[in-house]
C-alpha cells in the first residue's frame, strides 16, 4: 500500500526511525494521528491483528524517538502490538502484505528486520530474553539499553514472573514497559489484574502511595501514567534512559484506541479476518466443541472446562455464560492450566482443557508428570491442530502428534469431520484410564450433520473406500483430500481415527492384501502418526514399502491454509502426485 502524501504528510516523511528523530516534539501528535489512520486504512483492507496496535501508537513513537534503536534493544511481547513498530522501521509500504504468503511476518521476526531483536509469537518471553540482552550489554560496556514492552496479558504468565524474580536480584539496566490495557485476546482476569486496577485507582486518589508487587520484586516502579500522552511519554522515557537499575514503567492504554467500535469491543476487533458467509450453516470445529461442552454440562455438574485466555477462539463463550461455576479462564498460564486440571481429576471431577495446539507445547512437562504419569482422566481438546495459516511458524499446530505420541498411556484421536469430532470428545470424556486427546483443525467442518453422542471403540479405524494395490491410511481432517486422491489412484482409503492406540489389526490385514501403504497427516512426519505405522511394521518384520505424507522437518511460514497445503502437496492433486512420484522410483 503506497503512501498518499496528502493524507499522511508527517508519516510519509517519518517512514524510518532516522527520519522520525528529525521531527520536532510538537509534530509527534500529528504523526500519531496519521499512524493510527494509516493502520486503520491498511488493516481494514489486508486483515490482521488490529486493536492491540492501535493501543500502542504513542508508546511506539515515543520509544523510537527517545531510544537509539536498533542499537538499543526493543522487544515486543506479545507481537500483536508490533504493527506500528513495523511501519516506523522502514516497512510501511509493505505492511499491506502482512500475514500473506511471502509478505511481512505477522509478528516481530529477526530475519525480517534488524529492529526486530527477538522473534515472537507466544507470550511472556521478552523479560527473560531482555534480561539476557541487558546482562550482555553490561559486559559489552557500550551503554546499550534494553526495553521490553509487555502487554495484552503477557504479564499474567508464570514465565514473566520467573524472569522478574531473577532480574530483581541482578539489577541490570532493563526497562519493562507494562502496557496495561486490561486485555489479552480475551479480558484479563486474576489477582494480578485486580492488583493493577488497585494501582490505577490509587493513582487517581493519591500521589503519596507508591508501592506495588513489582517493588517487592526489587524493580523500581514508575506510574501508572497515561500511555496515550505523547509529551508525557517522551518526558518519562528521557528519564528512564538515564536510569541504571531495573525498572518497570506502568502505562495505561486503551486497546483499539482511536476506533470506537474496537474500543467498545476489543475482543471482536482483536483481529480482522475474512468472515464466513452469514448464510453458511457449516459449523467450525470450535463451535462443535463449545456446543458439545454445553450439552454435557446440562446433565453433568462435574465437568469442568479450562482455558488459558482463549475463551472466544476456542468456542467457549456460551459455556462460560451458561455454566460460570464450571468454567475457568486461568489467563495465559498453560502450565498451570494442565496441573490445575490434574487436581480437579484427583478430586473426582472431569476436567476438559481447551487449548490451541501451539500453546500446549508450553505445558509439556505438566502433561507427562502431572497427568499421564498419574493416569488421570483429563480430556485435552486441542484446537488449531495442523496448519493454521496466516499467523505463521509460531502458531502452526504441527508438532503435537509427535510430542504426544511418545507419552505412555495417552489416547490420541484425530477426527476427519465435525461429527466424528463430537463423538471423539464424548469418547474422551468417558475414558477413565488416563489422559485423552481430541485434536482438530482450525476452521469449518465439511457440513456433516451431528448425530447423538456415542462411544467410539478405542483404536478402531473405518474403511472409507476399497481399491487395489495401494492402501492409504489417513489421520485427521485431510480425509477429504485423501479421498479424492484415492479415487484417482483407485486406492483403498482408511480413516484411522486413532494415532494411539493404533489399529494394528487393520494394518496387518492391509499388509497381506496390498503392495504399498501410504500414511497422511497434517503435521510433521518426524515422530508423527506415520512414524507409528512404520515402527509397527518394522517390529512385525513386514516387508512392505511405506510412504509417509505430511510436513517436512522445517518451520512452516505464513500464508493461507489452502496455499500452504498446496505448497507442501497436501491438497488432492499434491497427494496424488506425491504417491505417483514415489511409485515411479
Curated annotation (Swiss-Prot):
Its cofactor is Mg(2+); thiamine diphosphate. Gene3D superfamilies: 3.40.50.920, 3.40.50.970. Mg(2+) binds at residues 152, 181. Binds 1 Mg(2+) ion per subunit. Binds 1 thiamine pyrophosphate per subunit. One of its GO terms (cellular component) is cytosol. GO terms for molecular function: 1-deoxy-D-xylulose-5-phosphate synthase activity; magnesium ion binding; thiamine pyrophosphate binding. Its EC number is 2.2.1.7. It is an enzyme of class 2 (transferase). It comes from the Bacteria. Thiamine diphosphate binds at residues 80, 121-123, 153-154, 181, 259, 334. InterPro entries: Dxylulose-5-P_synthase, THDP-binding, Transketo_C/PFOR_II, Transketolase-like_Pyr-bd, Transketolase_BS, Transketolase_C. Pathway: Metabolic intermediate biosynthesis; 1-deoxy-D-xylulose 5-phosphate biosynthesis; 1-deoxy-D-xylulose 5-phosphate from D-glyceraldehyde 3-phosphate and pyruvate: step 1/1. Keywords: Isoprene biosynthesis, Magnesium, Metal-binding, Thiamine biosynthesis, Thiamine pyrophosphate, Transferase. GO terms for biological process: 1-deoxy-D-xylulose 5-phosphate biosynthetic process; isopentenyl diphosphate biosynthetic process, methylerythritol 4-phosphate pathway; terpenoid biosynthetic process; thiamine biosynthetic process. It catalyses: D-glyceraldehyde 3-phosphate + pyruvate + H(+) = 1-deoxy-D-xylulose 5-phosphate + CO2. NCBIfam families: dxs, PRK05444.2-2. Belongs to the transketolase family. DXPS subfamily. Catalyzes the acyloin condensation reaction between C atoms 2 and 3 of pyruvate and glyceraldehyde 3-phosphate to yield 1-deoxy-D-xylulose-5-phosphate (DXP). Homodimer. This is 1-deoxy-D-xylulose-5-phosphate synthase.
Amino acid at each position: 500500500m503506497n503512501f498518499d502524501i496528502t493524507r499522511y504528510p508527517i508519516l510519509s516523511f517519518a517512514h524510518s526511525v532516522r527520519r522520525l528523530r528529525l521531527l520536532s516534539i510538537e509534530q509527534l501528535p500529528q504523526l500519531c494521528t496519521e499512524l493510527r489512520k494509516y493502520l486503520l486504512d491498511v488493516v481494514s483492507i489486508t486483515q490482521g491483528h488490529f486493536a492491540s496496535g492501535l493501543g500502542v501508537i504513542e508508546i511506539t513513537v515515543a520509544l523510537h524517538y527517545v531510544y537509539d534503536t536498533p542499537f538499543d534493544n526493543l522487544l515486543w511481547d506479545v507481537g500483536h502490538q508490533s504493527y506500528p513498530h513495523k511501519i516506523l522501521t522502514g516497512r510501511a509500504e509493505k505492511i499491506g502484505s502482512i500475514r500473506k504468503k511471502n509478505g511481512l511476518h505477522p509478528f516481530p521476526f529477526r530475519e525480517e528486520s534488524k529492529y526486530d531483536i527477538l522473534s515472537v509469537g507466544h507470550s511472556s518471553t521478552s523479560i527473560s530474553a531482555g534480561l539476557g540482552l541487558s546482562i550482555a550489554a553490561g559486559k559489552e560496556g557500550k551503554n546499550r539499553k534494553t526495553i521490553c514492552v509487555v502487554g495484552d496479558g503477557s504479564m499474567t504468565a508464570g514465565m514473566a514472573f520467573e524472569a522478574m524474580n531473577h532480574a530483581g536480584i541482578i539489577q541490570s539496566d532493563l526497562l519493562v514497559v507494562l502496557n496495561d490495557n486490561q486485555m489479552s485476546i480475551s479480558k484479563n482476569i486474576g489477582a494480578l489484574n485486580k492488583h493493577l486496577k488497585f494501582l490505577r485507582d490509587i493513582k487517581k486518589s493519591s500521589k503519596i502511595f507508591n508501592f506495588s508487587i513489582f517493588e517487592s520484586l526489587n524493580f523500581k516502579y514508575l506510574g501508572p501514567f497515561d500511555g496515550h500522552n505523547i509529551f508525557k511519554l517522551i518526558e518519562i522515557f528521557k528519564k528512564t534512559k538515564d536510569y541504571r537499575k531495573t525498572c518497570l514503567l506502568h502505562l495505561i492504554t486503551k486497546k483499539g484506541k482511536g476506533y470506537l467500535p474496537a474500543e467498545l469491543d476489543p475482543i471482536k476487533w482483536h483481529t480482522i479476518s475474512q468472515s464466513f458467509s452469514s448464510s453458511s450453516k457449516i459449523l467450525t470445529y470450535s463451535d462443535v466443541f463449545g456446543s458439545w461442552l454445553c450439552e454435557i454440562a446440562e446433565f453433568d455438574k462435574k465437568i469442568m472446562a479450562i482455558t488459558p485466555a482463549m475463551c472466544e477462539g476456542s468456542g467457549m463463550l456460551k459455556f462460560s455464560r451458561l455454566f460460570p461455576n464450571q468454567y475457568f479462564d486461568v489467563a495465559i498460564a498453560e502450565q498451570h492450566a494442565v496441573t490445575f486440571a490434574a487436581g480437579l481429576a484427583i478430586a473426582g471431577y472431569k476436567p476438559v482443557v481447551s487449548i490451541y495446539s501451539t500453546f500446549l507445547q508450553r505445558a509439556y512437562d505438566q502433561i507427562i508428570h502431572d497427568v499421564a504419569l498419574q493416569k488421570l482422566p483429563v480430556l485435552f481438546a486441542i484446537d488449531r491442530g495442523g496448519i493454521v495459516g496466516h499467523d505463521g511458524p509460531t502458531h502452526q499446530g504441527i508438532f503435537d502428534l509427535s510430542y504426544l505420541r511418545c507419552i505412555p498411556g495417552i489416547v490420541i484421536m484425530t477426527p476427519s469431520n465435525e461429527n466424528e469430532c463430537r463423538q471423539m470428545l464424548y469418547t474422551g470424556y468417558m475414558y477413565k484410564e488416563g489422559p485423552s486427546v481430541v485434536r482438530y483443525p482450525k476452521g469449518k467442518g465439511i457440513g456433516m450433520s451431528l448425530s447423538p453422542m456415542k462411544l467410539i471403540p478405542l483404536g478402531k479405524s473405518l474403511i472409507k473406500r476399497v481399491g487395489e494395490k495401494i492402501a492409504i491410511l489417513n489421520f485427521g481432517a485431510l480425509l477429504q483430500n485423501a479421498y479424492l486422491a484415492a479415487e484417482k489412484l483407485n486406492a483403498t482409503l482408511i480413516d484411522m481415527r486413532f494415532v494411539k492406540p493404533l489399529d494394528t489389526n487393520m494394518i496387518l490385514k492391509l499388509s497381506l492384501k496390498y503392495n504399498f501403504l501410504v500414511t497422511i497427516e497434517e503435521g510433521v512426519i518426524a515422530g508423527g502418526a506415520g512414524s507409528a505405522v512404520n515402527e509397527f511394521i518394522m517390529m512385525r518384520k513386514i516387508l512392505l514399502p511405506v510412504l509417509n505424507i505430511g510436513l517436512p522437518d522445517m518451520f512452516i511460514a505464513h500464508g493461507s491454509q489452502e496455499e500452504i497445503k498446496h505448497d507442501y502437496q497436501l491438497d488432492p492433486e499434491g497427494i496424488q502426485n506425491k504417491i505417483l512420484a514415489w511409485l515411479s522410483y
